[in-house]
Amino acid sequence: MSKEINPAVRLFGNRIYADQTSLEFLHEFLLIASAPKTWNEDGDTFESCLPRYTALDEGLNDGAQLKYAPRARLDLKLFSFLGASRLSSRDPAHHEHLNELREELGKKIMTEGDIAIGDVLDSLRDLFLGLQGAGNGRTWCAQTFLPLSRRCLAGETIWNQSKAHNNLTWYDSFISLSTYWSTNRHRFLARGGEVFYLQLCLALSRSKGDVNGLIHEAKLEFSAEEADPEQLHSKLEKGLSRLLDSSPHLDELAAFIENNDENESAYKTDLEHHFGSGRPHFVSTEAYPHACPKESWKIGYVFAVELSRILAMKLDPLERIAQLEMLFDLHILRHVTHLAAQRIKNEALPLPLANNWLGYSFVTSPENCTIPRLRKLSEISFRHTEQMLYDAVHSFVPEDEDERRQFYDSSTYRTQYYKEADKSHGFAVFRKIGKSMGFIVPRKGNGERLVLTENVLRTLVLALVPAGHDITYDQFKSEVYQHFGIVFDRDSIRLAMKETGNACDDPGYDIDVWVSTMLEQAAMLIPLSDSCSLVHNPVSLNMD
């Protein structure tokens, strides 16, 4: 089956893929933001994180493709990761080039006393190895760094080991680049970051009237700045630029390693050579509307607001990445579940939905749940979500008339049509991301249920409570529900179960005491009385 007729791609965009980790979703998103970009390969490129606000509409027509030019950063990856990669993946040509690289670097390092240059190089290697992000166990070039700065962002590169031969040198491998290196297979950076970058562009292109309609429909609490797409665009541009430029010393060290080879590796991998001149090697995103469903702009706008808030906060660099990764996790779950709910509603499928703008609700429980009724309700909520995603994907039939005829005539064809969607998209994504972030337990075995951990709760506070301010606990519960469909109190649980057609015994008045306890232990709850508490965001705004 081609990806164009994969029903999950038609529903969720190309592509939200289970084998892409949440850190790789974030990495790919920031990679696009940091790279030179263009809507037309023959036109002007732009270096800003986002397209100009006034140019968003031009690039969002059907068939439009955003093109971006990621750096491969092979020398930096080789220097950092080769020694920690699988022995079987270490090609002699790579070892030889690493030795050359270290030798040239050593000539530019001056030490005092009995400090050996080799020890300095080892310390520099260990620093960047400690910033390893995703891909542990892969070939060194297929691994990623934590996306802490511009030079920690690199495109996907895969070494075609089966094509290599004994006499191959590092530079020989670039003469026939596509033979020995693959830069466009999207195995790990599988386009999920592209989907959410394009979704952001789609959301910011909407009119102020559209956004006001969303705020009214979804009962959202946005500031005047957040309710204005142009002002939100400006805030996001500043926040993304600040993030990418927040570790200048790290970038200086990375530049020292990369530039030592006179950029020969980068010259071969990052540029296209036509008539003696080099221009950036562009990667094309998928075209609208296959790239990102246009009806997803509403959740895209809510995501843009949440993202802008966290980017504006004064956080330690590592915590900022952790919070952004968790926000991406929550948004991925929201993306697939909301679009599934919309499909079920539009096709009038016989599955009850939550009566909120998202169309779903997640009934959560504590990790170590001692309340059998609550544990059971959370399991039911998980299974209902599974059914939603399954039914939505399986409501699609082939668009091509001949294939549609085969679909109805052959059960084998029908099985094959949905096979990839069920295996690697849809609920496979929900399950994989949910378990990796701790939202679904247990990781293995039966009885899966939805839980609310301290890490998820902290991200919810940072995304929903203004920096350095407080909101009431009741308002916080409402915000969590309206943004993410997550419920944990008695009345909301009973309503959620009723709306989705599931019987529910009274779960008890103090069913959510565990949430307030977690907030209080994390210094994010201010008790005022038995009936009123404030949820506090302890992080201040970044005024730099």
Model-derived features with residue positions:
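Eukaryotic partner-binding/assembly regions in large regulatory complexes
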Residues: H165, T183-I440
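Generic structural signal of hydrophobic/aromatic residues within well-ordered alpha-helices
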Residues: L26-F29, F46, L56, L78, ...
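Alpha-helix boundary/N-cap detector
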Residues: Q20, D44, A69, R73, ...
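Extended, Lys/Arg-rich, non-catalytic nucleic-acid recognition/anchoring regions
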Residues: E112-E221, E226, E230
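Amphipathic alpha-helical surface "interface" segments used
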Residues: S149, D245, E262-N263, E499-C504, ...
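Intrinsically disordered, low-complexity serine/threonine-rich regulatory regions of eukaryotic proteins
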Residues: L78, G83, H97, L101, ...
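Charged, amphipathic alpha-helical stretches
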Residues: M1-D126, G130
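Extended, charge-rich low-complexity regions and/or helical-solenoid scaffolds
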Residues: A392-D544
